[in-house]
Curated annotation (Swiss-Prot):
Record's GO cellular component terms: cytoplasm
Cytoplasm listed as a keyword: yes
Complex and partners: Interacts with DnaA. Forms a 1:1 complex with domain I of DnaA.
Phenotype upon loss of function: Increases the number of observed replication origins. 15% reduction in sporulation efficiency, chromosomes continue to replicate during sporulation. Both DnaA and DnaD rest longer than normal at oriC during sporulation onset, more sporulating cells have active replisomes.
Sequence similarity: Belongs to the SirA family.
Major localization listed first in the record, in broad terms: cytoplasm
Keywords: Cytoplasm, DNA replication inhibitor, Sporulation
BP GO terms, sorted: negative regulation of DNA replication; sporulation resulting in formation of a cellular spore
Consequence of substituting Y18A: No longer localizes to mid-cell during sporulation, not toxic in growing cells, 2.5-fold reduced interaction with domain I of DnaA in E.coli
Taxonomic path: Bacteria, Bacillati, Bacillota, Bacilli, Bacillales
Protein's UniProt name: Sporulation inhibitor of replication protein SirA
Induction details: Up-regulated by spo0A. Expressed during sporulation, commencing between 90 and 120 minutes after sporulation induction in about 20% of the cells (at protein level).
Pfam families referenced in this protein's UniProt entry, alphabetically: SirA
Subcellular location per the Swiss-Prot or TrEMBL entry: Cytoplasm
Length: 148
Protein backbone atom coordinates (compact mmCIF):
# COMPACT_ATOMS: atom_id res chain seq x y z
CA UNK A 1 0.00 0.00 0.00
CA UNK A 2 1.29 3.43 -0.91
CA UNK A 3 2.06 5.90 1.86
CA UNK A 4 1.76 9.62 1.13
CA UNK A 5 3.28 12.06 3.60
CA UNK A 6 2.75 15.81 3.60
CA UNK A 7 5.67 17.31 5.52
CA UNK A 8 5.74 20.91 6.72
CA UNK A 9 8.40 22.94 8.49
CA UNK A 10 6.59 24.46 11.45
CA UNK A 11 7.86 27.70 12.99
CA UNK A 12 9.65 26.90 16.24
CA UNK A 13 7.30 28.87 18.48
CA UNK A 14 4.31 26.86 17.20
CA UNK A 15 6.21 23.57 17.28
CA UNK A 16 6.99 24.19 20.95
CA UNK A 17 3.43 25.27 21.73
CA UNK A 18 1.79 22.29 20.01
CA UNK A 19 4.26 19.64 21.18
CA UNK A 20 2.04 16.86 22.53
CA UNK A 21 -1.02 18.31 20.77
CA UNK A 22 -0.11 17.44 17.21
CA UNK A 23 -3.66 16.24 16.57
CA UNK A 24 -4.81 19.88 16.42
CA UNK A 25 -2.32 20.61 13.65
CA UNK A 26 -3.17 17.36 11.89
CA UNK A 27 -6.85 18.35 11.75
CA UNK A 28 -5.98 21.80 10.37
CA UNK A 29 -3.78 20.37 7.60
CA UNK A 30 -6.26 17.58 6.87
CA UNK A 31 -9.04 20.13 6.39
CA UNK A 32 -6.77 22.07 4.06
CA UNK A 33 -5.71 19.11 1.92
CA UNK A 34 -8.58 16.65 2.09
CA UNK A 35 -11.79 18.51 2.83
CA UNK A 36 -13.95 20.44 0.41
CA UNK A 37 -14.12 23.71 2.30
CA UNK A 38 -16.09 26.70 1.16
CA UNK A 39 -13.88 29.31 -0.51
CA UNK A 40 -13.82 31.68 2.47
CA UNK A 41 -13.08 28.88 4.94
CA UNK A 42 -10.36 27.48 2.64
CA UNK A 43 -8.68 30.89 2.38
CA UNK A 44 -8.76 31.29 6.18
CA UNK A 45 -7.24 27.83 6.67
CA UNK A 46 -4.58 28.61 4.08
CA UNK A 47 -3.65 31.83 5.93
CA UNK A 48 -3.41 29.92 9.22
CA UNK A 49 -1.08 27.38 7.63
CA UNK A 50 1.07 30.10 6.08
CA UNK A 51 1.29 31.78 9.50
CA UNK A 52 2.51 28.68 11.39
CA UNK A 53 4.84 27.29 8.72
CA UNK A 54 8.04 28.51 7.17
CA UNK A 55 9.30 28.02 3.63
CA UNK A 56 11.36 24.94 2.87
CA UNK A 57 15.07 25.89 2.70
CA UNK A 58 15.40 24.47 -0.82
CA UNK A 59 19.11 25.10 -1.39
CA UNK A 60 20.03 23.71 2.03
CA UNK A 61 17.80 20.68 1.41
CA UNK A 62 19.52 19.97 -1.92
CA UNK A 63 22.91 20.11 -0.20
CA UNK A 64 21.81 17.84 2.65
CA UNK A 65 20.15 15.34 0.33
CA UNK A 66 23.19 15.06 -1.94
CA UNK A 67 25.53 14.75 1.04
CA UNK A 68 23.41 12.08 2.76
CA UNK A 69 22.36 10.14 -0.33
CA UNK A 70 25.87 9.72 -1.75
CA UNK A 71 25.95 6.04 -0.73
CA UNK A 72 22.41 5.38 -1.86
CA UNK A 73 21.17 4.57 -5.35
CA UNK A 74 19.01 7.60 -6.12
CA UNK A 75 17.87 9.70 -9.05
CA UNK A 76 17.22 13.42 -9.10
CA UNK A 77 15.21 15.61 -11.45
CA UNK A 78 15.06 19.24 -10.32
CA UNK A 79 13.20 19.22 -6.97
CA UNK A 80 12.38 15.50 -7.04
CA UNK A 81 14.53 12.73 -5.58
CA UNK A 82 13.75 9.03 -5.92
CA UNK A 83 15.23 6.09 -4.04
CA UNK A 84 14.72 2.49 -5.12
CA UNK A 85 15.79 -0.19 -2.66
CA UNK A 86 17.73 -3.21 -3.97
CA UNK A 87 15.78 -6.30 -5.02
CA UNK A 88 12.63 -4.18 -5.50
CA UNK A 89 11.98 -4.13 -1.74
CA UNK A 90 10.52 -0.65 -1.95
CA UNK A 91 10.91 2.89 -3.17
CA UNK A 92 10.24 6.47 -2.13
CA UNK A 93 9.90 9.77 -3.95
CA UNK A 94 10.75 13.09 -2.26
CA UNK A 95 9.20 16.21 -3.85
CA UNK A 96 10.20 19.65 -2.60
CA UNK A 97 7.79 22.51 -2.94
CA UNK A 98 8.05 26.05 -1.59
CA UNK A 99 6.11 25.38 1.62
CA UNK A 100 5.87 21.60 1.78
CA UNK A 101 7.66 18.35 1.06
CA UNK A 102 5.71 15.37 -0.20
CA UNK A 103 7.08 11.88 0.29
CA UNK A 104 5.36 9.00 -1.48
CA UNK A 105 6.56 5.51 -0.62
CA UNK A 106 5.68 1.85 -0.95
CA UNK A 107 7.23 -1.41 0.14
CA UNK A 108 9.70 -1.43 3.02
CA UNK A 109 9.81 1.65 5.23
CA UNK A 110 13.58 1.91 4.72
CA UNK A 111 13.36 4.19 1.65
CA UNK A 112 11.19 6.88 3.28
CA UNK A 113 13.21 6.58 6.49
CA UNK A 114 16.31 7.67 4.56
CA UNK A 115 14.51 10.89 3.57
CA UNK A 116 13.11 11.43 7.07
CA UNK A 117 16.63 11.10 8.52
CA UNK A 118 17.82 13.92 6.26
CA UNK A 119 14.92 16.12 7.38
CA UNK A 120 15.67 15.38 11.04
CA UNK A 121 19.19 16.74 10.55
CA UNK A 122 17.86 19.96 9.01
CA UNK A 123 15.35 20.89 11.73
CA UNK A 124 13.49 19.40 14.71
CA UNK A 125 10.34 21.21 13.56
CA UNK A 126 9.26 19.04 10.60
CA UNK A 127 5.76 17.61 11.01
CA UNK A 128 4.91 14.67 8.73
CA UNK A 129 1.30 13.61 8.12
CA UNK A 130 -0.22 10.69 6.23
CA UNK A 131 -3.89 11.59 5.96
CA UNK A 132 -4.93 8.26 4.47
CA UNK A 133 -3.74 6.24 7.46
CA UNK A 134 -4.23 9.11 9.94
CA UNK A 135 -0.59 8.90 11.05
CA UNK A 136 1.33 12.02 11.99
CA UNK A 137 4.17 13.24 14.16
CA UNK A 138 7.34 15.23 14.54
CA UNK A 139 10.26 13.72 12.67
CA UNK A 140 12.49 14.73 15.56
CA UNK A 141 10.36 15.40 18.63
CA UNK A 142 10.65 18.95 19.88
CA UNK A 143 11.77 18.88 23.49
CA UNK A 144 9.41 20.52 25.94
CA UNK A 145 10.95 23.52 27.60
CA UNK A 146 10.58 23.87 31.33
CA UNK A 147 10.19 27.47 32.41
CA UNK A 148 10.87 28.30 36.03
Amino acid sequence: MERHYYTYLIKEEFANHYFGRESVMFELFQDYHWTSLEKQQYEMTEKQIQYITQPIPILHMHQRLKMNLNKTDYRQLDYIYRIALPKAKGHATFMMKEHMIEIVASGDYEAETIFFEVLRKVSPCFLAMDFNSKRYGWLNPVKERNFV
